[in-house]
């Protein structure tokens, strides 16, 4: 299956604006790695008494994704939270043999669009004894590039009568040829 971060990025890149006889991809902007300070890659172990805290710089105006690589396989159900940018997300691993067990060891956790240049991120163990990770990285893309792509799409003739609000999408989408229509519905 496609990596969650790449899936999101691919969906944004798949948005199409019809041009004169061609189709152009609406750019989502370049995916960028941000600078992480305050933790060593060898110290990525969560226990009940030890959280992982670090700072990320260069965040303002960017959608932030935390990538954790190589999560250890726990011997019991283990859950941890990720807090940063005013959001808290939780992630759970089940032990092998459990119905909820997954081979996915590299979660990608979205933390929204940052209003500040510097973010403090904290991982805390909620359930279980311990979980460790091989490494982490923080990726982002500039939200202004995404907004410019959305604005271009909203001006496209085939979307002229489409409107949306916080709870829905209304209107009709017309196309000169048959094919796929991709909709990305944001949620928080």
Question: What annotation goes with each model-predicted range?
Answer:
Residues 1-188:
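Active-site-proximal, structured, solvent-exposed surfaces of multi-pass membrane proteins
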